[in-house]
Amino acid sequence: MKILTGNSNKHLSQKISKFLKNRLVNSNIRKFADGEIYIEINENIRGNSIFLIQSVSSPANDNLMELLLSIDALKRSSAKNITAVIPYFGYARQDRKVVPRTSISAKLVSNLIEKAGADRVVTVDLHSGQIQGFFDIPVDNLFATPIFARHIKKKLKKNNIICVAPDVGGTARARALGKLLNVDLAIVDKRRPAVSYTHLTLPTRWDVG
């Protein structure tokens, strides 16, 4: 097993490498003058299982291309299998058509990752669970809620805590956290009158328990 890091999650990759006592794959990632991304694997990885750690966070377009080109480079370097570890899965918000003439970017990005050569995807708290169904390869969607709950219990007093879901889509996550903490739940009514405008209505009552 070997670990390759992209530019978006270097600190996380280094911590994982140190924890596993498994050094990072030697690679060269740079840009040409026109902004085109260049990736080179500088060591023999033939027959190895590779974990590529790269988020599709800001700048999302650059990080997405870096992810895809890294997968392609690993595939062409004869890696045995490639697991794309994507802590933040960008373009996941657009998981369905909310207006008639728009793209479903989550599906397109899923297709690109699979076509590039990934054999498995590991991510954290997908925007919506159905995105796992956009892939024909295994997808492990990990949940950070138990980790947050442990941290909150250590840092805050229970009688000062209320879990708030920012919209209906976040209710399941907020409820799961509220249950672990045994605290109340509030749900915010979120509406988008326009693409760049969001209207929030704060709750007037709490769901206790």
Where are these regions (language model features)?
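Conserved small/polar residues in nucleotide/adenosyl-binding loops
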Residues: 198-204
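Hydrophobic alpha-helical segments, chiefly the membrane-spanning helices
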Residues: 208-209
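Active-site loop-to-helix "anion-binding N-cap" substructures in soluble metabolic enzymes
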Residues: 2-11, 15-169, 175-179, 185-186, ...
